Amino acid sequence: MKYEGIDLICVPGACAALTALVSSGLPSSSFIFEGFLPKKQIDREKILLQISKNEKTTLIYESPRRLKKLLKELLEFCGGDREIMVARELTKKFEEHVGDNINEVVEFFREKDIIGEITIVIKGIKKGDLNIDKFSIKKDLHDLMNAGLSLSAASKYLAKKNGVK
């Protein structure tokens, strides 16, 4: 490629997303890179819902001060057993890889002060395997009905939220 008569070439360099994907051991033949999730809650929830249903491995960047919030959201949307790996400070002196499932990662970071650049790798679900937490669904249904929704309206809302037809 030329720009103003000068040949341009691409020089490969470190990429946190790909480094985290490879080091996670999670499926890497097909993946989705989300980058940083939007701050606007409705947009965030839309993407989190997509991640919860996705069969492909998902890569996310997150800031240290927002990591705990994101992990809590992933727990809510994907369930605690979903495989995940949180990589911090890749290719640096204090590189760290934490993961097995969302429950364990949430517990690991619960009381920690988090610093550094963070990349999260989330395993996709198996085809046809929607991860629905029945306890959470019942709690959500109860909360919605206490807020004044009818059983029918609350059920329709939760079905849509969880991708159940």
Task: List the predicted regions and their residue ranges.
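General beta-strand structural signal in soluble alpha/beta enzymes
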Residues: C10-G13, I60, V86
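Class I SAM-dependent methyltransferase SAM-binding "motif I" and its flanking Rossmann-like core
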Residues: K2-N54
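Alpha-helix initiation/capping motif
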Residues: L37-K40, I60, L130
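A contiguous loop/helix-start segment that scaffolds small-molecule binding in enzyme catalytic cores
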Residues: T57, P64-V164
